[in-house]
């Protein structure tokens, strides 16, 4: 006697690859990887699903397997002999799934951030060249501070550009949620660079030259280059501000909220760094004017110290912002409330427990919840879809004939279908949550068996 066990692979979020992990008889788990080919999905774990099962020791009674492409996923039918059930677990899949995968790219709507970084990169290189030339001829301490500032800015923009590129890598086995947080890492490194190289070195340079005995030479040339740098940095700042506005519009935030709580740190980092650059140039100009008017050279290193403190404040702000993103920040309260309200109002949900969310990348979230399902509503929804009369007829016939074996078989089949119906309800909830908040890329819903001490949300 044979029984057919169906396994559904959810490939909705991975149109080219998928894997299944299922249990048969509650005692065995097996896992397979599928690649999408022209003629459907093909098992690539061990050439065929049959060889995968047979590779496990103590596995007996395998009759046949069949895997077909069913549009949104893969349907696999495994026929087994009831008398020789699967009794072992296939565990060697771990080595297979932890191999390094070929790096792919994913599309992220961050053109505004990329444009801001690229513009700032070239502008900082041009400004650095101008400032370095002026410092070489004038030996101004405040201009030296601006040279160091430009070096730090250029290096930091390069780090941000690398972070943008690396964050677009597609998810793989080692990082199933993707690499979107890479931009947080490199933004944090960039901020540390501003603090150490930009702020620290600039302040030290100013303190060391507080007792300079003579004003810096060639101040006129320095003033001209400061003006030119101001125009270049100002243009880059305008591009960064436009980038921040677009990012805020995409996330439905005000510009102020986006600067403090937005999910993409890149454009904010560019804007704050360019803003500090423009302010630093204004401070440098004021310092040179003060030296020229008073003849006192102390205003030159004082300007350097002020610029260094400005960079330090910018760096601390960026460090804190990226730190919160890296340690696992929840998604916005508005989106979270929207999801919880939807779940509480759904007919199959009795109670919610341990609901959590996390930002896994710019505009991308993960949501998790434990749900106490309303079993009666799950069954009613299932019977509405399949027809209750068919099941009632089978139960009546088994009861009329007094066939306990047939009754047990019907009850087993009915129980299996109810479990499948619960899975369908979970799939429906996950899909509707993602439609409600499109930024939620991953939804994990678990069935919860409540106890009197459980704190319901």
From Swiss-Prot:
A single Gene Ontology CC term: vacuolar membrane
Vacuolar domain ranges by topology: 137-141, 205-220, 289-297
Keyword Transport: yes
Cytoplasmic membrane side: 1-115, 163-183, 242-267, 319-457
Membrane topology, as annotated: Multi-pass membrane protein
One Pfam family here: Cation_efflux
Primary location: membrane
Keywords from the named record: Membrane, Transmembrane, Transmembrane helix, Transport, Vacuole
Subcellular locations according to the entry: Vacuole membrane
GO biological process: zinc ion transport
Single GO MF descriptor: monoatomic cation transmembrane transporter activity
Transmembrane stretches, start-end: 116-136, 142-162, 184-204, 221-241, 268-288, 298-318
Entry function: Involved in sequestration of excess metal in the cytoplasm into vacuoles to maintain metal homeostasis.
Family the UniProt entry places it in: Belongs to the cation diffusion facilitator (CDF) transporter (TC 2.A.4) family.
UniProt protein name: Metal tolerance protein C4
Organism taxonomic ancestry: Eukaryota, Viridiplantae, Streptophyta, Embryophyta, Tracheophyta
């Amino acid at each position: 006697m044979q029984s057919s066990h169906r396994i559904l692979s959810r490939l909705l979020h991975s149109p080219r690859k998928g894997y299944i992990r299922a249990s048969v008889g509650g005692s065995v788990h097996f896992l397979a990887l599928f690649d999408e080919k022209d003629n459907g999905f093909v098992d690539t774990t061990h050439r065929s699903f049959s060889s995968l099962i047979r590779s496990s020791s103590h596995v007996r009674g395998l009759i046949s397997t069949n895997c077909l492409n069913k549009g949104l996923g893969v349907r696999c039918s495994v026929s087994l002999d009831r008398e020789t059930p699967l009794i072992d677990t296939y565990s060697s899949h771990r080595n297979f799934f932890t191999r390094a995968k070929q790096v792919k790219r994913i599309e992220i709507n961050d053109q505004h951030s990329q444009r801001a970084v690229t513009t700032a990169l070239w502008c900082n290189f041009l400004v650095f060249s101008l400032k370095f030339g002026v410092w070489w001829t004038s030996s101004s301490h405040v201009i030296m501070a601006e040279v160091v500032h430009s070096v730090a800015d250029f290096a930091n923009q390069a780090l941000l550009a690398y972070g943008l590129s690396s964050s677009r890598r597609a998810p793989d086995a080692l990082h199933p949620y993707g690499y979107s947080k890479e931009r947080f890492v490199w933004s944090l490194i960039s901020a540390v660079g501003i603090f150490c190289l930009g702020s620290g070195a600039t302040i030290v340079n100013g303190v060391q030259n507080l007792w300079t005995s003579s004003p810096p030479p060639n101040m006129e040339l320095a003033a001209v280059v400061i003006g030119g740098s101001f125009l270049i940095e100002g243009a880059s700042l305008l591009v960064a501000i436009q980038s921040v506005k677009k990012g805020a519009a995409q996330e439905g935030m005000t510009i102020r909220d986006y600067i403090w709580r937005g999910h993409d740190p890149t454009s904010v980092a560019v804007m704050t760094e360019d803003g500090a650059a423009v302010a630093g140039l204004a401070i440098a100009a004021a310092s040179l004017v003060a030296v020229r008017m008073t003849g006192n050279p102390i205003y030159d290193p004082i300007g350097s110290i002020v610029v260094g403190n400005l960079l330090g404040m910018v760096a601390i702000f960026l460090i804190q912002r990226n730190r919160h993103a890296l340690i696992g920040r929840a998604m916005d309260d508005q989106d979270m409330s929207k999801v919880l309200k939807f779940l509480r109002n759904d007919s199959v949900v009795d109670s919610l427990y341990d609901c959590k969310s996390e930002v896994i990348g710019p505009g991308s979230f993960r949501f998790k919840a434990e749900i106490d399902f309303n079993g009666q509503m799950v069954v009613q929804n299932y019977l509405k879809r399949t027809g209750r009369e068919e099941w009632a007829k089978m139960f009546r016939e088994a009861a009329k004939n007094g066939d306990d074996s047939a009754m047990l078989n019907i009850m087993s089949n009915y129980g299996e279908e109810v479990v499948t119906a619960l899975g369908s309800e979970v799939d429906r909830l996950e899909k509707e949550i993602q439609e409600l908040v499109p930024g939620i890329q991953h939804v994990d819903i678990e069935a919860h068996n409540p106890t009197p001490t459980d704190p319901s949300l």
